[in-house]
């Protein structure tokens, strides 16, 4: 029993290399430690795990470094792929030499070839086509690989797809509400009491019938007059001076009853045709005045001719 207690008390000693006076004694203790570790029950190992970790493990540090590299390997790979300098190549020349003529013509240069060393001004000019490097198509290698390996470049495309999907989903109710409302509205008003229902519930029916407004709009009614009505209205308008005054209400009402036209319609007709007929009257008056002047001139000329004949 004392040996067992001594073994329990001396278990951590072989781990520390400073103890052990002789080499053989240290060797025996080290050998006994391996033997005890192999023959110890599981409960004894559990008690050892509760103790602080051994110094060699902390001193070497291989376990911690391994875990650290193991957990950060994916991030390092993606980060290295992002910061890696891409290989840029300039391919065929895209300069349009017929732009002034409104056409499209290229020189046929297939790849940019610098005229000088890197860093010099001549390196920006192509030795084949003598065009600037910006005219050549730029091709970057490694962009697809970096975006595919990096986890930060994979979320935005999915997010855009989801946003587009949400837009489609949000647009569907607006597209589906109108046909359903119209169908329900028609179903409710297919009976014989539809007109009475619309008159009683004017607010709700007006809001529900908004989609059908372009189809339910009626054309404005235009009154058609006979030639006799037009002549009588024209003569009456000229008499009253193309204005209806309050003192003439009785006369206007009597005239409207005679020709079969409402007072409001007569007033609108006079307002719309006042300028038109006034221009015609002015033109007719000018023509009449010109005819009178011409007639007077002809009379004077004929009189002068007679006088010339009589005098000799």
Swiss-Prot record:
Residues 20-74 are annotated as: Disordered. One of its GO terms (molecular function) is zinc ion binding. Keywords: DNA-binding, Homeobox, Metal-binding, Nucleus, Transcription, Transcription regulation, Zinc, Zinc-finger. Residues 218-281 bind DNA. Its main location: nucleus. Induction: Induced by exposure to long days. Putative transcription factor. Probably involved in the regulation of floral induction. PANTHER family: ZINC-FINGER HOMEODOMAIN PROTEIN 2, ZINC-FINGER HOMEODOMAIN PROTEIN 4. This is Zinc-finger homeodomain protein 4. The lineage of its organism: Eukaryota, Viridiplantae, Streptophyta, Embryophyta, Tracheophyta. The gene is ZHD4.
């Amino acid at each position: 029993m004392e040996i067992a207690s001594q073994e329990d008390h001396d278990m951590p000693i072989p781990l520390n290399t400073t103890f052990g006076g002789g080499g053989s004694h240290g060797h025996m203790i080290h050998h006994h430690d391996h033997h005890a570790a192999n023959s110890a029950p599981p409960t004894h190992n559990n008690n050892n795990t509760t103790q602080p970790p051994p110094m060699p493990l902390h001193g070497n540090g291989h376990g911690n470094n391994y875990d650290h590299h193991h957990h950060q390997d994916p991030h390092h790979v993606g980060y290295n792929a992002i910061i890696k300098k891409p290989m840029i190549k300039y391919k065929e020349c895209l300069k349009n030499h017929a732009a002034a003529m409104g056409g499209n013509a290229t020189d046929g240069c297939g790849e940019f070839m610098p005229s000088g060393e890197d860093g010099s001004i001549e390196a920006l000019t192509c030795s084949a086509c003598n065009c600037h490097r910006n005219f050549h198509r730029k091709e970057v290698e490694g962009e697809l690989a970096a975006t595919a390996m990096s986890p930060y470049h994979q979320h935005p495309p999915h997010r855009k797809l989801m946003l587009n999907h949400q837009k489609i989903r949000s647009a569907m109710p607006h597209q589906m509400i109108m046909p359903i409302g119209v169908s329900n509205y028609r179903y409710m008003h297919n009976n014989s009491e539809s007109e009475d229902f619309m008159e009683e519930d004017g607010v709700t029916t007006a809001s529900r019938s908004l989609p059908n407004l372009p189809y339910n709009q009626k054309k404005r009614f235009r009154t058609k007059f006979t030639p006799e009505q037009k002549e009588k209205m024209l003569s009456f308008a000229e008499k009253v001076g193309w204005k209806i005054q309050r003192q003439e209400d009785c006369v206007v009402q009597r005239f409207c009853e005679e020709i079969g036209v409402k007072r409001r319609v007569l007033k609108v007709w006079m307002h719309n045709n006042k300028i038109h007929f006034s221009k015609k009257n002015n033109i007719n008056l000018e023509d009449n005045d010109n005819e009178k002047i011409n007639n007077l001139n002809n009379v004077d000329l004929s009189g002068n001719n007679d006088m010339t004949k009589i005098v000799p």
